[in-house]
Amino acid sequence: MVKSHYICAGRLVRILRGPRQDRVGVIVDIVDANRVLVENPEDAKMWRHVQNLKNVEPLKYCVSVSRNCSAKALKDALASSKALEKYAKTRTAARVEAKKACAASTDFERYQLRVARRSRAHWARKVFDEKDAKTPVSWHKVALKKMQKKAAKMDSTEGAKRRMQKAIAARKAKK
């Protein structure tokens, strides 16, 4: 599905590259076909500036403001629509925050994370192996059940049912 987040005054955008990377702003005005004025009064580094459209990602949130509105009007519109709070709850915002936290982490924090991942993998493997020892899981059986389910949907004629029963009987006789 194609994203249809059109460029218009009031559209929230995320900066992709440069010193303001991953910051969110609002399109205040459209300069020409390639550039827009972007501002976020709640972020000190996002003062009103020109951004190239190749450098912004339009988000699905939009604020109702007029073109070239004042910073006060933009701040009021952002507060009333709560667009920044809605964006903060998205997966993209969480991913950006995680990336920032990972970049800001110390060597010891990265070591702790590595040890925690290794421990979690060990315990998951141990639990799976214990359950597998009690009731072995054959991936061939799982695949066979999936094939049977598909075949049951595909072949609903009497002849097909007989063929399926014959195959099942042959498999049981093999055991």
Curated annotation (Swiss-Prot):
UniProt GO MF annotations: RNA binding; structural constituent of ribosome
Superkingdom of the organism of origin: Eukaryota
UniProt keyword Protein biosynthesis present: no
Basic and acidic residues biased stretches: 152-161
Matching Pfam families: KOW (PF00467), Ribosomal_L14e (PF01929)
UniProt keyword Ribonucleoprotein present: yes
Annotated Basic residues bias: 162-175
Cellular component, GO annotation: cytosolic large ribosomal subunit
InterPro entries: KOW, Rib_uL2_dom2, Ribosomal_eL14, Ribosomal_eL14_dom, Ribosomal_eL14_KOW, Translation_prot_SH3-like_sf
Stretch list, region Disordered: 150-175
Disulfide partners: none
Biological process terms in GO annotation: ribosomal large subunit biogenesis; translation
Name of the gene encoding the protein in the UniProt record: RPL14
Function summary: Component of the large ribosomal subunit. The ribosome is a large ribonucleoprotein complex responsible for the synthesis of proteins in the cell.
Keywords, in A-Z order: Ribonucleoprotein, Ribosomal protein
Family stated for the protein in its record: Belongs to the eukaryotic ribosomal protein eL14 family.
PANTHER family, A to Z: 60S RIBOSOMAL PROTEIN L14 (PTHR11127), LARGE RIBOSOMAL SUBUNIT PROTEIN EL14 (PTHR11127:SF2)
UniProt-recorded name of the protein: Large ribosomal subunit protein eL14
